[in-house]
UniProtKB/Swiss-Prot annotation:
Residues 1-85, 153-158, 211-327, 382-403, 453-492 are cytoplasmic. The chain crosses the membrane at residues 86-106, 132-152, 159-179, 190-210, 328-348, 361-381, 404-426, 430-452. This is Progressive ankylosis protein homolog. It comes from Xenopus laevis. Belongs to the ANKH family. Pfam families: ANKH (PF07260). The lineage of its organism: Eukaryota, Metazoa, Chordata, Craniata, Vertebrata.
Length: 492
């Protein structure tokens, strides 16, 4: 009789990952709800969707790096003093982001970035800059939320983090429904998704901060003891954070770059506006079945026994590295299955777009091919997430920086080359994104192999030194040998 392996060690992983996965999917649902708030507007729905999509993707460029401060909270924050340093970093970053939002909205720089580079008309450009100004405070609220989310994850409160994100989405959906029946639909329809986004962000931030104060604040020391390396410095936090922030910034800037090249490829025509609208609609739907795989990178820092912080948070940890690898593979298989069921089963993807976002069926049919390309994203995303988590545990994130550069190079190369092969519109955008993901994951794998070999070589050297020390310890000292000789002589 074949004995099945015990599933007991996998339950902590499941309890940890499921709320995070739901969180990621909930964020995508929130984006779809916001898009529905635009699509439901009777007049100029495609133009409004394109304007909001451009502004939102640019805003995500600023919020992206801040969301990676979650990992700083997960790895570094062991005391109240560490938390204050992390919060201070995010306050400064939020202020800088708000200044950039204002500059882009009011200066010639914004006119050049949005109108000239994207080749959009005055109407779309004006609405995009206005929406971008309205979104100026979102990066700051996002930063506060993610910092406390990381601290909660360190102490295994992933359920609370998931609840906060679901509450965010529920608030967005409710307020979109309410505002669609207000005078805003006629006077300023752009404010419908933007105000709903603010309400949701406020709910999430408040939930996470209250959760921190209720469950963790009184339990952690004022400062970190020497057994976990003492207090983390701002320099250490930023050194750990900047490669992750660079990677996420390049991921988030990828969408604006894609919008830019797709729009320019079609010459700023009506077809270009339609293509950007298709990308705006397909991003959250395509991202939903695989986006949660990114959360796998939080598993290693939370569960690996070599991480001193995780030892404090979970002393009786039954999860081994093999369990983490097996669970990662299972997550990838599940994501691939979801992608192919949702995007390759006839009429399923169209129904999602029509029922959830509220677009018409003809527009939904134009989204089918881009969505099918999203089916291949789970493989590179899983590889990247798993290896990034391992490198975070070792605090070797600096080796990840080249992967972000390669991603942008591959992305732009694809956006330039593919039109010569007859690929245009939203298909060009999503196909180039896939190429960028593959390039980035390949570089992460190479960086991980480099670190692994260095770690192995270092371990072998240490073992050799310990072996020599042990051999020397086993031999009697010179004084002991002399005593033995003297005893023998007396005996004779």
């Amino acid at each position: 009789m074949v004995k099945l392996p015990s599933l007991t060690p996998y339950w902590p992983l499941i309890r940890f990952l499921v709320p995070l996965g739901i969180t990621n999917i909930a964020i995508d649902f929130g984006e779809q709800a916001l898009n529905r708030g635009i699509a439901a507007v009777k007049e100029d729905a495609i133009e409004m969707l394109a304007s909001y999509g451009l502004a939102y993707s640019l805003m995500k460029f600023f919020t992206g790096p801040m969301s990676d401060f979650k990992n700083v909270g997960l790895v570094f924050v062991n005391s109240k003093r560490d938390r204050m340093k992390a919060v201070l970093c995010m306050v400064v970053a939020g202020i800088i982001a708000a200044v950039f939002h204002t500059l882009i909205a009011y200066s010639d720089l914004g006119y050049y970035i949005i109108n000239k580079l994207h080749h959009v008309d005055e109407s779309v450009g004006g609405k995009t800059r206005k929406a971008f100004l309205y979104l100026a405070a979102v990066p700051f609220m996002d930063a506060m939320a993610w910092t406390h989310a990381g601290i909660l994850l360190k102490h295994k409160y992933s359920f609370l983090v998931g609840c906060a994100s679901i509450s965010d989405v529920i608030a967005q959906v409710v307020f979109v429904a309410i505002l669609l029946h207000s005078h805003l639909e006629c006077r300023e329809p752009l404010l419908i998704p933007i105000l709903s986004l603010y309400i949701g962000a406020l709910v999430r931030c408040t939930t996470l901060c209250l959760g921190y104060y209720k469950n963790i604040h009184d339990k952690i020391p004022e400062s970190s003891g020497p057994e976990i390396g003492g207090d983390a410095t701002i320099k250490k936090m930023l050194s750990f954070w900047w490669p992750l922030a660079l990677i996420l910034a390049t991921q988030r800037i990828s969408r604006p770059i894609v919008n830019l090249f797709v729009s320019r490829d079609l010459g700023g025509s009506t077809a270009a506006t339609e293509a950007v609208a298709i990308l705006t609609a397909t991003y959250p739907v395509g991202h939903m079945p695989y986006g949660w795989l990114t959360e796998i990178r939080a598993v290693y820092p939370a569960f690996d026994k070599s991480n001193p912080g995780s030892k404090l948070a979970n002393s009786s940890n039954p999860v081994s590295k093999t369990h983490i690898k097996n669970x990662t593979f299972a997550c990838m298989a599940l994501s691939l299955t979801l992608c192919f069921v949702m995007f390759w089963t006839p009429n399923v993807s169209e129904k999602i777009l029509v029922d959830i976002i509220g677009v018409d069926f003809a527009f939904a049919e134009l989204c089918v091919i881009p969505l099918r390309i999203f089916s291949f994203f789970p493989v590179p995303v899983t590889v990247r997430a798993h290896l990034t988590g391992w490198l975070m545990t070792l605090k070797k994130t600096f080796v990840l920086a080249p992967s972000s550069i390669l991603r942008i190079i591959v992305l732009i190369s694809s956006l330039i080359v593919l039109p010569y092969l007859g690929v245009h519109g939203a298909t060009l955008g999503v196909g180039s994104l896939l190429a960028g993901f593959v390039g980035e994951s390949t570089m992460v794998a190479i960086a991980s192999l480099y670190v692994y070999r260095k770690q192995k070589k270092k371990s072998e050297t240490e073992n050799a030194v310990e072996g020599e020390d042990s051999a020397m310890t086993d031999l009697p000292h010179n004084e002991e040998l002399t005593d033995i000789v003297e005893i023998k002589e007396d005996g004779e």
